[in-house]
Amino acid sequence: MNASVVLNLHLISDSTCETVAAVAKSALEHFRSIEVNEFVWSFINSCEQIDKIMSLIEHDKYNFIMYTMFDDDIRRYLKQKAEVQEIPCIPVLSRVIRELSCYLHVKKDPYVNTGMGLDDEYFTRIDAINYTIAHDDGQNLWDIDKADIIILGVSRTSKSPTSIYLAYRGYRVVNIPLVNSINLSVDLSSMKNKLIVGLTIDIDRLIEIRKTRLVSMRNQNNCQYVDYEHVLVEIKETKRICMQNGWPIIDVTQKSVEEIAATIIQYFNKMQH
């Protein structure tokens, strides 16, 4: 593999993923020329969740799995699925645990919390989560200059869940809804050293999502919210604003939050170099 090849690194854990992420970070320090997209899959505790993860992996790319998994059955299932798809699948703790058990002649505990301690990275992440929640849906823009990432998009394009996912990774995120005929209250074009990214989506898929949303809210009389021409204008305006300012646009149609976040992190890392 050379520097022009991108590695999709999948970190899987039945806990918070902090342990496997820390090991991965240390390992990658030895390969700084390699471009890496990280996909973090936390609290995985069923074979169905493993199936979903494996179905989302793009097989025409370089993929690598690192994991911590306490349940023996789920761990074996993950390894079997990875073998079938010919993806390297490396446990980061099993060898150490096995060697300790053999050496001391003591069985491993029936349950263990694999989360890490309250270090600086932990508090940085908590701060990012608090900041991101406070700035969800265009709120509290008075200190937007403290954000690492600003996400724009029309309603129901996964802005909020993507923001929270990124916050868990330690990024301060502001997400701002773009609404027709309403001007932004801040001048984003003057923002320096901020990644600003727009989210767009297939119009038919967006209308379908919005209709489901209206049903759940028992507010099916909001015709403009799901009107094809109105929604089309919203999407076009988002693209126009982003293209005019040179901000990247991500099509989130059929993409998971993890995939959207991985793409945003890739843009962010490129901006830093």
Curated annotation (Swiss-Prot):
Signal peptide: none annotated. Pfam families: Kinase-PPPase (PF03618). Bifunctional serine/threonine kinase and phosphorylase involved in the regulation of the pyruvate, phosphate dikinase (PPDK) by catalyzing its phosphorylation/dephosphorylation. It comes from Ehrlichia canis (strain Jake). Its EC number is 2.7.11.32, 2.7.4.27. It is an enzyme of class 2 (transferase). InterPro entries: Kinase-pyrophosphorylase, PPDK_reg. This is Putative pyruvate, phosphate dikinase regulatory protein. It catalyses: N(tele)-phospho-L-histidyl/L-threonyl-[pyruvate, phosphate dikinase] + ADP = N(tele)-phospho-L-histidyl/O-phospho-L-threonyl-[pyruvate, phosphate dikinase] + AMP + H(+); N(tele)-phospho-L-histidyl/O-phospho-L-threonyl-[pyruvate, phosphate dikinase] + phosphate + H(+) = N(tele)-phospho-L-histidyl/L-threonyl-[pyruvate, phosphate dikinase] + diphosphate. Keywords: Kinase, Nucleotide-binding, Serine/threonine-protein kinase, Transferase. Belongs to the pyruvate, phosphate/water dikinase regulatory protein family. PDRP subfamily. ADP binds at G153, V154, S155, R156, T157, S158, K159, S160. One of its GO terms (molecular function) is phosphotransferase activity, phosphate group as acceptor. Transmembrane segments: none annotated.
